[in-house]
Amino acid sequence: MVRLLISTGEVSGDLQGSLLIQALQREVERRSLPLELMALGGPRMQASGAELLADTAPMGAIGLWEALPLVLPTLRLQSRVDHVLKQRPPDAVVLIDYMGANVRLGHKLRRWFPRVPIIYYIAPQEWAWRFGDGGTTQLLSFTDRILAIFPVEAEFYSQRGAKVTWVGHPLLDTVSVLPDRQQARERLGLKPGQRLLLLLPASRQQELRYLMPTLAKAAALLQQRDQSLEVIVPAGLASFEKSLQEALEAAAVRGRVLSAQQADELKPMLYAAADLALGKSGTVNMEMALRGVPQVVGYKVSRITAFVARHFLRFRVEHISPVNLLLKERLVPELLQDELTAEALVQAAIPLLEDPAQRNEMLEGYRRLRQTLGVPGVTDRAAKEILDLTKT
C-alpha cells in the first residue's frame, strides 16, 4: 500500500491535481500497487478518487490585505489536517503550486517526517519574479525533487542546486482535437455570423471583486459596438455563480453564466466557438493559447498590496501572462492595476475581433509557444516519477 498526500489550492490547482490523480491511478494499476490518496484540494480531485481532507479551492488569495479574511479558516483547517497526518503519515508528499500554504506545509512535514520524499510539481514561478533567491532557498530546503513544467523553470531550479525533472506542461494532456467550430456554435445556440466573447475573471474570490466589474463593463461596451455579440462567463466554482450573474446585470450585459458543472462539460465547445477571451492572468492564459483563442489579459490587486509589492518587496516582472513570459515578448495584450479599465480592454479587444491580421499574428505566436512546452503524456511522466521516488 502506498499512501500519498497531494496538496494544492484554488481552481487551477484542483484541475491539475485531478489530472495527476488520474495518471497516478493508471500507473499504480500498471504496477499492481494499492494506492491511498489523501488531498488538500477541491471537488475535481475528490471526483477523481482522492479522499479530500480539506477543500482549499476557494481559499486562494494574493496579497497581505486580501489574505486576512482567510487567516482563521486556514488555521482551523491546518489543525484538522495536522491531526489526520499524524495518525496516517504519508509515504510521499506532492505539492502543486499554491506557494504560501505549500511552502509552510513543506517545512512542517520535513520536520515531522524527515525520510518522506517531498515532490514539488508545478513549482512557484520564481524564475519570472525579481524577489531574489530567498524563497527559492526556502523551497529547496524541504524539497527532494521538482517536477518542472517549463524548460526555463527546470534550468532555474537546477542552477540553484535542486534535483529537477522536466515533464512538460500538463495542459498538453487536455488538448485533444476540438469539436467542429460550426457544431460547437450550434450547440451553444449561436446564430450565423454572431461572435462569442468569453469572460474568464477568477479562480479566487478576490479576483471576482477586482476584475469582474471591469470585464463586464468592457463586454457591455463591446455589445454597444456589436449588438449581436454573445457573452458567456464559465464559473470556476459553484460559489462564484451568483456574483458573476450580478456583475453582468449591474453592467447591463446581455450574457449568461454557466454553472461550474456546465463549464466543465461545455469547455471544448466554448473554446471551439469563441472569438475572443477577456480574462485574468494565470493558467487560463495557457489554456486559451493551447486552444487557439485570442485573448486580452488583465490583473488587479488592492492598492495596499500593490504599494507593498512595489515599494517594499521590490516586485518586478516583465510580463504578467505566462504566455508572454515564456515567449519573452508581449504577444498577448496585458493591463495591470490602473491600466485595467473597461475602455482599455475594449481598445485592445477590437483589433483581435475585427482585424484578421492581428488574430493570425497571435495564433502564430501560440504555435511557437506550444513548441516549447514538451509533448503529451505529461501527467503520466509525473506520476511515474512520483511513484519511483516513493518509499514502499
From Swiss-Prot:
Pathway: Bacterial outer membrane biogenesis; LPS lipid A biosynthesis. It catalyses: a lipid X + a UDP-2-N,3-O-bis[(3R)-3-hydroxyacyl]-alpha-D-glucosamine = a lipid A disaccharide + UDP + H(+). Keywords: Glycosyltransferase, Lipid A biosynthesis, Lipid biosynthesis, Lipid metabolism, Transferase. GO terms for cellular component: membrane. The keyword Lipid metabolism applies. It is an enzyme of class 2 (transferase). GO terms for molecular function: lipid-A-disaccharide synthase activity; phospholipid binding. It holds the Pfam family LpxB. GO terms for biological process: lipid A biosynthetic process. Its EC number is 2.4.1.182. InterPro entries: Glyco_trans_19 (IPR003835). Condensation of UDP-2,3-diacylglucosamine and 2,3-diacylglucosamine-1-phosphate to form lipid A disaccharide, a precursor of lipid A, a phosphorylated glycolipid that anchors the lipopolysaccharide to the outer membrane of the cell. PANTHER family: LIPID-A-DISACCHARIDE SYNTHASE, LIPID-A-DISACCHARIDE SYNTHASE, MITOCHONDRIAL-RELATED. Belongs to the LpxB family. This is Lipid-A-disaccharide synthase. It comes from Prochlorococcus marinus (strain MIT 9313). The gene is lpxB.
